[in-house]
Amino acid sequence: MAKHSRLQSALEYSLARVILCSLGALPRCVAVSVGVGIGRLAYLLPGNLSRTGQRNLEIAFPDMDQRERARLLRGCFESLGRLLGEFSQLPKATPEKLRRLIEYDEVGLRHLREAEKNKRGVIFLTGHLGVWELHSFGWSALEYPLSFLVRPLDNERIEEMVERIRTRFGNRAIDKKSAARQSLRVLREGGTLGILSDLNTQPYEGVFVPFFGKLACTTAGIATLALKTDAVVIPTCAVWDRKKKRYFFHGDPPVELVRTGDHAKDIEVNTANFAAAMERMVRLYPNQWLWIHKRWKTRPLGEAEIY
């Protein structure tokens, strides 16, 4: 069994390396076009991912016609393909090239600089929206390196390869399994911490708050960190602007923290506010969110399953 596992891991790593190196050898525009093409092909294939996406879109947009939902789901797959193409280019990216490729939102920049001036930590409240791998990478290219929470991949060799790319310009990955102490240190030292806030979680590590009008089990960790460190929480994401042919690093004003003196209530209220901020960004760029994730999988006790 162990031998089979080692062989399987080696094959997975070899395949991942071939794909990334093959795309990485292409000019950026070609690699991205190939990636988008792969995404379009994946959209056409029947399977659980498409069914999950369709179900999620029914929940989020109950009044939307089927044709428009199909357009958004196709965009989701295309965005994933774009992510693959762009990620393959990061090993050879330079700060100069990235600055030409990215437009930074002045709102997000202003609040980031203000927090830095006041020596306050910053939490980038983000999610699987647009090209999230480029998001953290792009900030480090602008000389704002950050730490970010990750769940390591099961294949250690692929994880090492991916982490080398992610951390080229000074970013630092923090394993979610042991994140609390390191995350607190980053924020208390005035650093920036990126957290993907839009994943389904379990009740022991989250709370149920509305997301697109339906309760979703959402991580309580962001609220806990923000309340303990008085960090500035900035909703932000990296999305493709088709008209400008550039990426736009969207930034909203910080989410104001609520403090009532009731810890449990503060966690729930602030988590709900963070989820609402994430929802607003998804509504702005609905064809670039990860609709194929089972966001509403965990249900309150006694409620029927969704998927």
For each feature predicted by the language model, list its residue ranges.
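Membrane-anchoring hydrophobic helices of lipid-metabolizing enzymes
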Residues: M1-T126, E159-E163, G170
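Non-catalytic C-terminal accessory region of glycerolipid acyltransferases
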Residues: A2-L7, L26, V36-I38, L49, ...
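Short, flexible loop segments at the rims of nucleotide/cofactor-binding pockets, characterized by
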Residues: L98-E103, R151, R168-I174, F212-G213, ...
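A conditional alpha-helix N-cap/helix-loop micro-motif detector
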Residues: I102-D105, L129, N155, A173-K176, ...
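Short amphipathic alpha-helical segments and helix-helix/interface helices
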Residues: L109-R113, S136, V162-E163, S183-L184, ...
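Catalytic core of membrane glycerolipid acyltransferases/transacylases, capturing the structured
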Residues: E116-K177, N200-V207
